[in-house]
Amino acid sequence: MSIRSLVLAVLCTIAFPAAAHAAVPNSRDGEVKLMCRAINTFRAQNGVAPMKMSSPLVSAATWMSSDMATKNYFNHSDSLGRAWNTRLGAFGYWGSAMGENIAAGAVDAATTINQWKNSAPHRAAMLNPSYLAMGVGRGYSASSAYGSYWVADFGSSLDRVSDC
């Protein structure tokens, strides 16, 4: 781990202590893995290369989905007032091309990806050939307006990646 990554990890833990601990279980969510695979299947069906899962993007997406669920809002700007691209940088991800899809209400990956496929901007983000990496997160709160909240963050840099 580089000094820069270590410093960023410490700063994120200090700045977001509850979120850092709450985010980890969702990153292993079976529906999240299904979403990653579904996005790559959709890309393959449209002649676009698959993306890898990026650890910083997974962290950012998981934090954001949990933040929306626990604080009961639905927006690309988070509860701290940061735009999505600023948030990705705060989680250690920088790329020349980046994007974000969000959804709320659907509990499963299949319903959510179908919503995104039927929305031109969300469809374009999933099929953008400049995006090589993604991170998917799903948050849930029974007391929130929508229950389930999904975030898929995309980027052009391959930073700490693995297969879905």
Residues of each region from the PLM?
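Disulfide-stabilized extracellular recognition modules
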Residues: 104-164
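Bacterial N-terminal signal peptides
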Residues: 8-15
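Sec/Tat signal peptide C-region and signal peptidase I cleavage site
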Residues: 16-22
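A short alpha-helix/helix-coil micro-patch that ends at or immediately precedes a cysteine
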Residues: 23-71
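Extracytoplasmic
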Residues: 30, 48, 83, 97, ...
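Short, surface-exposed glycine/acidic/tryptophan-bearing loops
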Residues: 59-107, 126-128
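Bacterial N-terminal signal peptides that target proteins for export
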Residues: 1-7
